[in-house]
Amino acid sequence: MSEYMKNEILEFLNRHNGGKTAEIAEALAVTDYQARYYLLLLEKEGMVQRSPLRRGMATYWFLKGEMQAGQNCSSTT
């Protein structure tokens, strides 16, 4: 993964206290699939975490340790 893209994603998540895959993709001018790919790599590196997976629900991404227990992760898209 390029350092540029890694830094852009981490900066976005820091500024917005997390975000949906589609929001991140739009902000970085990449496809949803590209954003998801980069986010999964960052997750493997232990730098980001995502909301629990639920069928039909949007995935929210956060900097590792930033997701709060009471945070609402139930809205779609």
From Swiss-Prot:
GO biological process: regulation of DNA-templated transcription
Keyword Repeat: no
Keywords assigned: Activator, Fimbrium biogenesis, Transcription, Transcription regulation
Annotated family: To E.coli AfaF and DaaF.
Function: Plays a role in the inhibition of methylation at the GATC1028 site located in the regulatory region upstream of the pabA promoter. May, in conjunction with the Mbf (methylation blocking factor), inhibits deoxyadenosine methylase from methylating the GATC1028 site.
Protein name per its UniProtKB record: Major pilus subunit operon regulatory protein
Species the sequence originates in: Escherichia coli
Gene that encodes the chain: papI
